[in-house]
């Protein structure tokens, strides 16, 4: 089994690319953020986050798909629990044991985050809009900070990884970058 983990801030294109990739890959399954994220947006309990991820990995072991396309995983949990990625090293080891793993970090140019969030809010459900509280400006600042932390995590991950800039929404080019890895 091959695992492709998408990380990135809200509105970076994770769902779009996951669906496009699943259409191209035979016998693939998308694991949504509804399955991978703990219910609390700010969970500072690193032990609970790691335990939650371990349980998910146990579920993944039973999966028969050739490709698991995962929407957010340990980088997001490390960010939300204010942990270092080192504290999630056992999770990375377990992911490697499952099979070939690729971590794909999607980014948006910092100057474009506010506009992308605003655009995304126009078509997302009300529940998504409530996810990050505050004004549009405050949300943009929060997501810019999250993106910078995710980039720092990407630099120290032990998993094979790539960063893809999705500012221009060139989804075909993004798919090519993933396929070339």
Regions inferred by a protein language model and the residue ranges of each:
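A glycine- and Lys/Arg-enriched "phosphate-lid" helix/loop adjacent to the NTP-binding pocket
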Residues: 95-149
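Loop/turn-to-beta-strand initiation segments
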Residues: 64-68, 99-102
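Charged helix-capping and loop-helix junction motifs
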Residues: 84-91
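P-loop (Walker A) phosphate-binding loop of NTP-binding proteins
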Residues: 9
């Amino acid at each position: 089994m091959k695992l492709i983990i998408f990380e990135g801030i809200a509105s970076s294109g994770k769902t779009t690319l996951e669906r496009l990739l699943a259409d191209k890959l035979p016998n693939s399954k998308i694991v949504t953020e509804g399955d991978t994220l703990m219910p609390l947006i700010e969970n500072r309990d690193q032990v609970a986050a790691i335990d939650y991820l371990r349980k998910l990995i146990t579920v993944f072991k039973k999966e028969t798909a050739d490709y698991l396309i995962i929407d957010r995983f340990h980088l997001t949990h490390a960010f939300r629990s204010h942990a270092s990625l080192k504290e999630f090293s056992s999770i990375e080891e377990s992911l490697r044991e499952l099979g070939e793993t690729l971590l794909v970090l999607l980014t948006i140019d910092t100057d474009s985050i506010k506009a992308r969030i605003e655009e995304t809010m126009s078509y997302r459900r009300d529940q998504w809009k409530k996810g990050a509280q505050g004004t549009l400006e405050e949300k943009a600042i929060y997501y810019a900070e999250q993106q910078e932390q995710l980039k720092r995590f990407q630099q120290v991950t032990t998993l094979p990884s790539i960063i893809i800039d999705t500012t221009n929404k060139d989804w075909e080019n993004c798919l090519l970058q993933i396929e070339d890895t």
